[in-house]
Amino acid sequence: MADSRNGNARAPPSGVPPKAGNTYSIDVKNFISRARALYEHWKKHSADLWGSADALAIATPPASDDLRYLKSSALNIWLLGYEFPDTIMVFTKKQIHFLCSRNKASLLEVVKKPAHDELKLDVIMHVKPKGDDGTGLMDAIFRAIRDLSRGDGNDSQVVGHIAREAPEGKLLETWTERLKNANFQFVDITGGLSDLFAVKDDTEVMSVKKAAYLAYSVMKNVVVPNLESAIDEEKDVTHSALMDLTEKAILEPTKASVKLKPENVDICYPPIFQSGGKFDLKPSAASNDELLTYDPASIIICAVGARYNSYCSNVARTYLIDATSLQSKAYEVLLKAHEAAIDALRSGRKINTVYQAALSVVEKNAPEFVDKLTKSAGTGIGLEFRESGLNINAKNDKVLRPKMAFNVSLGFQNLECESESRSKNKKFSLLLADTVLVTDQKPELLTKCSKSVKDVAYSFKEDEEEEKPRKKARTSGSENYITKTALRSDDHVVSKEELRKQHQAELARQKNEETARRLAGDSSGAGDSRSTAKTSADVVAYKNVNDMPHKELMIQVDTRNEAVLLPIYGSLVPFHVATIRTVSGNQDTNRNCYIRIIFNVPGTPFNPHDSNSLKNQGAIYLKEVSFRTKDSRHSSEVTQQIKTLRRQVMARESERAERATLVTQEKLQLAGNKFKPLRLSELWIRPPFSGRKKIPGTLEAHANGFRYSTTRPDERVDVLFANIKHAFFQPAEKEMITLLHFHLHNHIMVGTKKTKDVQFYVEVMDVVQSLGGGRRSAYDPDEIDEEQRERDRKNKINMDFNHFANRVNDMWQLPQFASLDLEFDQPLRELGFHGVPHKTSAFIIPTSSCLVELIEYPFLVVSLSEIEIVNLERVGFGQKNFDMAIIFKDFKKDVLRVDSVPTSSLEGIKEWLDTTDIKYYESKLNLNWRQILKTITDDPQSFIDDGGWEFLNLDGSDSESGGSEESDKGYEPSDVEVESESEDEASESESLVESDDDEEEDSEQESEEEKGKTWDELEREATNADREHGVESDSEEERKRRKMKAFGKSRPGTSGGGGSSSMKNMPPSKRKHR
């Protein structure tokens, strides 16, 4: 809304064109296409729009810090991409002349050859030396105009110029004076330029859309929250203060949750805030220094204009506070008229029909308001905030065409309120404005900020019987007019809680219906989600006896054939390493060394993917064997060789089984010569590649996916766009890393690891250790410089990642990727909370579609669309923290628990769950979700008949303890069960496969070192014997309770069985005997 405050669209931040050799350059392809459009338009509309001009003279004034819009600057930016201040351009039928400084001429050199080759136009540079007035160069241009005109048979030359732009600066004043004395005829070409700029190309349309997105995001995410905060807390805020706050949000888009580069955005005009009876709907309006007024019958008008790549957008809204009936009626009529005007912006219609559509609505619904309606319904918008010639009024008969953009602005000026209780609010105005794009079909609204009555009208009055005000108005005298409760302190909280309860009740009804439908259609019932074991090839070390090596009679390790040769009864007997469960060695006081080998027997498979040891269960198996020797060196060497070989074979078999379950994906299409792939360098990857020495790599965005690679040929990962379920960009704020994270639909292999989450990150701070040893002062210059360098490095890395993410987002907007619905999501830190999703505390942050924790490994990514309900457990008075159980729609999936969430985060989490339409319950105890879900899937009809999930809604009744355990002694996970024999043994072997190398060795030494049967096996035998005799002793109950403590905080939902093998094989009884 700037008319007198016209704003120059400057591409370089300094407002001057870039110098040769720097990062700025002219887009030659863009120049050719638009120069061709200029000449074609000039030729086609020479008589009616260009005044039959033989030449077009465009003089751009020097740069200015004032916010202004000029046709000459607009032509510069439209044609060349930048504004060229203090420059003269002259277009003739066969030549383009530039009169400018040397630096500008060197930048313009790149257009000479393409213009001649493709447009048959000669580009001629007239370089003005410093200190010269340029008169000689101007005479040369005049001669060229006359020569070309004589060649066409014209004696008199007509020169088109922009009549409204007065000359500024010495060069332009000299030019104007000499041009007038050159005996040319002059015509105004403003209409021709306006019509040329009216229809946008695809690049311009995208810039207008991004500008509109920024404008309405600032309105929605900055303006409205600040207004509500000021009203809610009864703050004294001036219009100018709100203007400054809003302007900063436009110039720093991240404050409005918009991912646009700050250097590409600007304001169209200083944001406008008006209230208190003083309103001006003209584009030149300004925010004054008076306080924002929000008394009853108050009107607040807010207008925001934003630019992206110099293209403008606008949005304006009116907010009503305890509106009177007249104000409500006037707004409803204005809203209908505004929507009618937008709907009338159809290709082929005349512009005056748009204004007539709005006027007809007012005449029909409120004829008394007709004389108060603004005389214009807006203007065209683009490089200029107000494109002359495209005013939406009753006289403009120009025809609408696709890809025209309009600022549809309509209002009522100086209406009078029937209530005279407040003279300040007696007069009021209303205004609505939106940026709209004309298309081949219906118009496209670009500023999608709500303007419905329910979203802009605020009511703070209590019912008539409760009309005693709780608080006096800030500006009231002896009378009390305001009784606000909808956004005021205690009453506001109660109202908000009631609304949330109502919404949760509706969600409960919907969720029960949805669950009933899903269970009714689920024929699988309580099927097991675990995959069946895969049988690999038979474990055979040697096909016949002749293949065995002939060595001396001692324990040997044949690495090539993966066999261990044991001397038994005078012969070497081969055992495949896959048959060995553990090996250990120790030494007694007599220097005798013992090597003890325990083999796999039926019921304890080599790994979870192999079932060979389940074959021939009726045969006799060797359980364990021990050897004694005096050679300690050989003993330790053999033990280590067997462990190493077993570990290698185990890893290979595990990787082979994992790869067999992978989903086949398409090939990555590398970027060819058409475009250079987007690239981020010096990144680290998680999960990392195997190997001791890690090296950074490069992430590239190709035609259909990403490729991460290092200098090592075997370290390469391809992530296809089609396999990405969620993409996240998390800049470093309070963390040490900036990251890009991809959560995938199907697993991929990263080195030898199978994963659904791949992350690429950079550490934003270098670890520096001072060798001086002394403590530095807080004001030490070196310390300050170092901190500044760290801040600069962090900001640069964040900017690089942000640029990469934005470029990829633009790529994902292409039609071929539209079905994937991909966009980099950014975590919302203000909604985050601390909790323990795995083993350590982490900061968990919601995004628009997920709940994530991307810093600590293992990562947490939960899709909100997959959540059935959330149960908040151990919620009660006096508790410092509580637990959050997330139940998924797939009941075969283990429940995810986030433990030890601070109680201070409870209200925020409940509010977030409610706003994302997730049903939540609260309970005082932890529930046994494995048993609950098993009961539901076993008998879904009973679950539905009993009211579905409403069994959780027991208001803290202790009857919940049917599936729970007491938690008054502090947190103990209640869903850890005493596992059956088969589960115990399976998880035992699984933990061996999935644990790290060091953990595995420790586990073997601690759990298998001095026993044949494990302690679990011995205890189970004793327990079974007791059960056969009908005995269940108190000590057994005590052992169960202690065993759960021994498991620590592991849960079936996260670890698949809980604990490592060393924990499983060390029950309380063993600790007690030690």
Swiss-Prot record:
Keywords: Chromosome, Coiled coil, DNA damage, DNA repair, DNA replication, Nucleus, Transcription, Transcription regulation. Residues 974-1009 have a biased composition (Acidic residues). Residues 505-520, 1010-1032 have a biased composition (Basic and acidic residues). It is found in: Nucleus; Chromosome. Residues 955-964 have a biased composition (Low complexity). Residues 1-21, 505-534, 954-1074 are annotated as: Disordered. Widely expressed. Present in embryos, shoots and roots, whereas it is not present in terminally differentiated cells such as mature trichoblasts or cells of the root cap (at protein level). It comes from the Eukaryota. Component of the FACT complex, a general chromatin factor that acts to reorganize nucleosomes. The FACT complex is involved in multiple processes that require DNA as a template such as mRNA elongation, DNA replication and DNA repair. During transcription elongation the FACT complex acts as a histone chaperone that both destabilizes and restores nucleosomal structure. Component of the FACT complex, a stable heterodimer of SPT16 and SSRP. This is FACT complex subunit SPT16.
